[in-house]
């Protein structure tokens, strides 16, 4: 049995890393009491809360946190007609927070994620580990069998090319979860009582050319390097699919990171995932995606971006054209999704003008 950490009595971190360069984005439909547990690690940072569902509902945020809160009315007001690209009644709405942030780094976490304990019983400061991951290079071109060579106590093994040891910039840090695993509905149904109790003390770079199923509940990224590609798609209300928002974004960002020679890391940090979602509800959301993914994944595996695509925006627009051309025959939904991908980039550039942000 794995339990969350007890952080009562832990002091608020007096020297938080990147305090003025990082926003924490939280999508929610409920009060954010879970932030009490995270206070020692997260209180010094600015929060962007994206309220899903009924905009008239009052969301309670624990005292002492600095935050902005956006509901659907705010999204419609800020984006106008382009608000159609932001999902409703789905945690995919979190990507609006990425768009309105003005910071270099983003950490996003779900409201059912608590502080985990490492094997020694110490509370895990997930954000601090994400920051370490992002500030260290990645090694996507050659696999290091000691995993992350830049971690303390590790290095490049014998036979690792010296020409590749400088590594590349890390764009994404993908964390994991103890307790409730991030399973699809069919797996949930056959393993309803399974809990993840394995804490693997490792961080690794996902190799170039390899896709992965990105989970958005414990994720950090360099907004300047990959932000415009962190679009969580059209999910939830009025859409034929759900629970593929983070994975769609993950497939897109991995193709783009590979093209632009950027790194994606996975492994530490862990959070404690407290609440199992309903597998029958999940199956209804995932049903089409379970079949579609058998064609979507080969599509991304074979996606090749042109040499002319040198910015994230250019890469993403090229990818949207490929989605329209190659996946629309699968379902008309992908035609709509491809259009939404373009709308997302237009909205991003409106709120983040390249000249002002330095992201040409």
Swiss-Prot record:
Spell out the SUPFAM superfamilies in the cross-references: Nucleotide-diphospho-sugar transferases
Q: Which cofactor does it need?
A: Mn(2+); Mg(2+)
- Catalysis performed (reactions): UDP-beta-L-arabinofuranose = UDP-beta-L-arabinopyranose
Q: Which GO terms describe its cellular component?
A: cytosol; cytosolic ribosome; Golgi apparatus; membrane; plant-type cell wall; plastid
**Organism domain of life:** Eukaryota
E.C. number: 5.4.99.30
Where does the chain cross the membrane? none
Question: How is this chain modified after translation?
Answer: Reversibly glycosylated in vitro by UDP-glucose, UDP-xylose and UDP-galactose, but not UDP-mannose.
Q: What does this protein do?
A: UDP-L-arabinose mutase involved in the biosynthesis of cell wall non-cellulosic polysaccharides. Catalyzes the interconvertion of UDP-L-arabinopyranose (UDP-Arap) and UDP-L-arabinofuranose (UDP-Araf) in vitro. Preferentially catalyzes the formation of UDP-Arap from UDP-Araf. At thermodynamic equilibrium in vitro the ratio of the pyranose form over the furanose form is 95:5. Is not active on other UDP-sugars (UDP-Gal, UDP-Xyl, UDP-Glc, GDP-Man and GDP-Fuc). Functions redundantly with RGP2 and is essential for proper cell walls and pollen development.
The text the record gives for the protein's domains is:
The conserved DXD motif is involved in enzyme activity.
Listed name of the protein:
UDP-arabinopyranose mutase 2
Q: What is the lineage of its organism?
A: Eukaryota, Viridiplantae, Streptophyta, Embryophyta, Tracheophyta
